[in-house]
């Protein structure tokens, strides 16, 4: 207000009078100053008003100073807050960086875990595959070992089977031969042939066969000696048997011939032995042999061996012939045996066939030597010529099945000659009879073969020719027409 009054005074205006007086001139218009109180005159108390104004100014200044102080304090606090905020921001950045690093490490760890899991799964799969392969290999190796063992067993059995079968067949045939030889009457008597002729014949043969043939002929000669002359020669027989066995071990052919000669030797020793040895015969003709043995015992005391040989009847001679023919059949059956072997062993089969052929030739040569040695001493000159002709014919046909029958027939003839040396007429008749029988057997054996050949040729004939038929059409015949009955 004081300022307004001072401004009005400076302006030189007239302060209008209020209600107490009218300070304006007449005739002038009304102005704004006339409305306000600035135009009033200063009262007497204006000094006090100035003092109040000064006080008020001081207060205002004091308030301004306080305001300035507050502003400065707020500025300082703001700066502090800004600094704290910057520190917090830095810390936050650090925490964010640490967090990002932690997350990156976690992600890397997860990736590594995944890779390790994948590797572990792959290794497990590989180990499983290797284990399965090892199991398969072990199974296959076990199967191969089992198959190899089975094949070895089969090969061993297949190798042993033919030998066992051959041994069984040979053993059965030997037993059959022994039984047949035991069925022959035991009162044979023969004279010892001169050793010069046998030795000359042996020297004409090969060196490899000479030793075996001489041993076999010597055994046959010792077996054919009459046992009336010596009874207590048991000590002399043992070394002879051992020598014969030693030579027979090296030669399979001479072994069987030696066995046959041993059986003949035992049969020849029966008349001088007691009657307890006679019932050992196991053939169906054993009863007849027992009866004949009783007759021969009664005649032994009265007659010599040559007279006893004449008492033998024709049926007994027939039995001897049948026994010899059965021996021939057994031997022929023995040499015709062929073991069933697989086709892979053709070389072994050929070797066995060669061995059998050599064995047959050795047996034939041994029997021929025995027959010649016996017949030279007992039979006459024309009989010797006939036998020489037969032997020459046999040598040319040793590989045929016929010579076995011929040799066995001659063996029967020799036995009959040894049985009855004092009756040459009966022996000649028997020789002629056996010749006729052998010729008939040969003719019968050859005829069916010719008939079989003719039948085969007729059965394998050429089909009858037909004229060329006219072809109606080259189309295929329908099924219903094909299925029709003719």
Swiss-Prot record:
Q: In what ranges is there compositional bias, type Basic and acidic residues?
A: 331-346
The role this protein plays is: Plays a central role in chromosome cohesion during meiosis I by preventing premature dissociation of cohesin complex from centromeres after prophase, when most of cohesin complex dissociates from chromosomes arms. Required for the timely assembly and maintenance of synaptonemal complex (SC) during early prophase I. Required for maintenance of centromeric cohesion before prophase II and correct segregation of chromatids during meiosis II. Has apparently no function in mitosis.
Report TM segments: none
Q: Which gene encodes it?
A: SGO1
Keyword Coiled coil tagged: yes
Give the chief site where it resides: nucleus
Residue stretches of biased makeup (Basic residues) = 387-396
Effect of disrupting the coding gene: Complete sterility, due to shrunken and inviable pollen grains. Premature separation of sister chromatids before metaphase II causes defective meiosis of the male meiocyte.
The superkingdom listed in its UniProt entry is: Eukaryota
The protein's matches in InterPro entries, at most eight in alphabetical order, are given as: SGO_plant, Shugoshin_C
Q: Which residues form a coiled coil?
A: 71-154
Q: In which tissues is it expressed?
A: Highly expressed in roots. Expressed in panicles. Expressed at low levels in leaves.
- Cellular-component GO terms for this entry: chromosome, centromeric region; nucleolus
Per the record, the similarity remark reads: Belongs to the shugoshin family.
Q: Please note every region of biased composition (Polar residues).
A: 423-433
Q: Specify one Pfam family.
A: Shugoshin_C
Q: Where is this region: Disordered?
A: 137-163, 187-209, 222-251, 323-346, 382-403, 418-467
Q: Where in the cell is it found?
A: Nucleus, Nucleolus; Chromosome, Centromere
Q: What is this protein called?
A: Shugoshin-1
What is the protein's species of origin? Answer: Oryza sativa subsp. japonica (Rice)
One GO biological process from the UniProt record? maintenance of meiotic sister chromatid cohesion
């Amino acid at each position: 207000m004081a300022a307004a009054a001072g401004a009005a005074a400076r302006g030189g205006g007239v302060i209008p009078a209020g209600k107490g007086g009218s300070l304006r001139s007449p005739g002038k218009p009304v102005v704004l100053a006339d409305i306000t109180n600035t135009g009033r005159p200063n009262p007497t108390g204006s000094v006090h008003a100035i003092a109040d104004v000064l006080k008020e100014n001081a207060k205002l200044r004091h308030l301004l100073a306080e305001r300035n102080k507050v502003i400065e304090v707020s500025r300082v606090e703001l700066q502090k807050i800004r600094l704290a905020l910057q520190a917090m921001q830095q810390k936050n950045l650090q925490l964010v960086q640490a967090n990002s690093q932690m997350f990156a490490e976690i992600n890397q760890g997860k990736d590594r875990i995944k890779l390790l899991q994948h590797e572990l799964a792959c290794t497990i799969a590989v180990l499983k595959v290797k284990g399965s392969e090892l199991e398969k290999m072990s199974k296959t190796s076990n199967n191969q070992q089992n198959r190899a063992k089975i094949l070895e067993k089969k090969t061993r059995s297949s190798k042993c089977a033919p030998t066992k079968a051959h041994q069984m067949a040979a053993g059965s045939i030997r037993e059959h031969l022994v039984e047949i030889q035991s069925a022959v009457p035991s009162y044979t008597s023969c004279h010892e042939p001169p050793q010069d002729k046998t030795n000359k014949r042996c020297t004409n043969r090969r060196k490899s066969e000479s030793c075996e043939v001489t041993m076999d002929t010597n055994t046959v000669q010792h077996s054919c000696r009459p046992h009336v002359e010596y009874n207590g020669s048991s000590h002399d027989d043992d070394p002879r048997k051992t020598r014969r066995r030693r030579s027979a071990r090296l030669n399979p052919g001479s072994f069987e011939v030696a066995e046959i000669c041993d059986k003949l030797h035992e049969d020849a020793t029966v008349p001088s032995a007691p009657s307890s040895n006679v019932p050992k015969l196991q053939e169906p003709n054993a009863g007849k042999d027992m009866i004949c043995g009783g007759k021969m015992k009664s005649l032994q005391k009265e007659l010599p061996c040559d007279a006893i040989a004449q008492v033998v009847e024709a049926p007994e001679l027939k039995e001897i012939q049948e026994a010899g023919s059965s021996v021939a059949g057994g031997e022929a059956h023995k040499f015709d045996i062929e073991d069933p072997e697989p086709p892979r062993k053709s070389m072994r089969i050929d070797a066995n066939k060669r061995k059998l052929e050599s064995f047959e030739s050795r047996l034939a040569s041994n029997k021929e030597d025995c027959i010649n040695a016996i017949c030279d001493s007992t039979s006459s000159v024309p009989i010797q010529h006939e036998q020489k002709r037969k032997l020459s014919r046999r040598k040319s046909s040793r590989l045929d099945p016929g010579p076995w029958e011929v040799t066995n027939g001659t063996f029967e003839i020799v036995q009959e000659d040894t049985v009855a040396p004092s009756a040459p007429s009966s022996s000649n008749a028997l020789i002629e009879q056996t010749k006729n029988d052998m010729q008939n057997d040969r003719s019968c054996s050859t005829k069916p073969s010719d008939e079989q050949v003719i039948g085969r040729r007729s059965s394998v004939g050429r089909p009858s020719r037909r004229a060329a038929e006219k072809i109606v059409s080259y189309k295929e015949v329908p099924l219903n027409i094909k299925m029709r009955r003719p």
